[in-house]
Design a protein with these regions (language model features):
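Sec-dependent bacterial lipoprotein signal peptides
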Residues: 1-20
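C-terminal/domain-edge helix-coil "capping" segments
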Residues: 157-194
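Short acidic, glycine/proline-rich loop/turn micro-motifs
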Residues: 60-63, 105-108, 157-159
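Bacterial Sec signal peptide processing site at the extreme N-terminus
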Residues: 14-38
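N-terminal segment of the mature soluble domain
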Residues: 41-101
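Surface-exposed short loop/turn segments
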Residues: 89-142
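Beta-strand elements of well-folded, non-transmembrane domains
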Residues: 83-85, 97-99, 129-137, 149-155, ...
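Short acidic, glycine/tyrosine-flanked loop/strand segments centered on an H-E-D-like triad
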Residues: 46-57, 136-162
Length: 194
């Protein structure tokens, strides 16, 4: 007994559609990024100001919306968690760069590109910050750090999986920034560290 292709096509379509509706396990992504697992860096300053330098660079809000914690928020939280005031003078932490670049991969060619998974992309996060100390007696000190990290995400990720992967990329970038900045503080701002 032979089955004609035309008769089997609707059944095949239903089977394929049912396979597409398989349940997807949610991926947990924290809604904030904290740096309080390490002790704060106690500075001999009365307060620590946090500001962001306006570089005039274009911000792609569509790309930033993919991040549970955008890089500029992560940098502000780093300064709040890691820099502790306790003396005289002023500390000023300036966010010089907190950018994300997205390079989209082209969709697959042919029918796969029309119905296949969404294409992936390469994401590059660059963060740069500067800490200045303005002492009561007019002394000044400064250190800075700049870190860039990139990751290519494969196509077909769920929105939750992509958000988690970008969170992990942000965390890796900020972990490297934290290490560089702490080294710089201890090396160049040691007179103001308790």
């Amino acid at each position: 007994m032979t089955i004609r292709w035309q008769a089997a096509a609707p059944a095949l379509v239903l089977v394929l559609l049912a396979a597409c509706d398989a349940p997807v396990e949610p991926v947990e992504t924290p809604s904030e990024m904290r740096f309080s697992e390490k002790p704060p860096i106690a500075l001999n300053v009365a307060r620590v100001e946090i500001e962001k330098m306006d570089t005039g660079e274009r911000v792609d809000h569509e790309v930033l919306a993919k991040f549970a914690v955008p890089p500029d928020e992560a940098m502000r939280q780093w300064a709040r968690d890691r820099l502790q005031a306790g003396g005289g003078g002023t500390g000023r932490f300036t966010i010089l760069t907190a950018s994300v670049e997205e390079e989209k991969q082209p969709p697959a060619k042919g029918a796969v590109g029309w119905v296949g998974p969404a294409p992936g992309g390469r994401y590059t996060i660059t963060v740069e910050g500067r800490l200045e100390i303005l002492g009561e007696g007019g002394q000044r000190g400064m250190t800075a750090a700049k870190v860039a990290r990139a990751k290519t995400l494969e196509g077909g990720l769920t929105a939750d999986e992509r958000t988690r992967a970008l969170y992990d990329l942000t965390l890796a970038t900020m972990t490297a920034f934290d290490e560089q900045m702490e080294r710089g503080i201890r090396r160049h701002l040691n007179p103001w560290v308790f």
